[in-house]
């Protein structure tokens, strides 16, 4: 919200409420980690994963369906309720990559530029590894 950053130049939004990182399989409450903005590691891992897949398959146009371990019909929320089974379908790798990074914003963990830079860094790392490590067998 900007209200607790101890910066007098920040105009806080008193109506901002992050979803918070969901507490799973425990009674601990949801939380928003108290760390400053950096390129998102979560977005970086996603950028590396999806860029590796694009490099390997030679296309971004791969549709797939994913079920998170958070919403698998088994995992308990912080008050002991079973979370529903929810599948998410993606039309492309880049759509999943973007949503993966965006999730950190909804949780109140990162800003949009953290997502953008995290994805960019992950892609660069994937390209470096893919182009310099993986070689075809003769």
Predicted regions and their residues:
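Membrane-embedded catalytic cores of phosphoryl/pyrophosphoryl-handling enzymes
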Residues: 1-138
């Amino acid at each position: 919200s900007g209200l607790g950053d101890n910066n007098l130049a920040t105009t806080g939004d008193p109506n901002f409420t992050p979803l918070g990182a969901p507490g799973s399989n425990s009674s601990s409450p949801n939380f928003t980690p108290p760390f400053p903005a950096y390129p998102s590691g979560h977005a970086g891992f996603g950028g590396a994963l999806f860029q590796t897949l694009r490099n390997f398959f030679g296309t971004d146009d791969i549709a797939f369906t994913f079920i998170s371990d958070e919403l698998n019909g088994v995992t308990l929320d912080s008050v002991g309720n079973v979370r529903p089974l929810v599948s998410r379908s993606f039309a492309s790798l880049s759509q999943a990559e973007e949503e993966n990074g965006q999730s950190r914003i909804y949780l109140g963990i990162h800003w949009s530029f953290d997502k953008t830079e995290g994805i960019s860094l992950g892609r660069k790392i994937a390209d470096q590894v893919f182009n310099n490590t993986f070689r075809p067998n003769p």
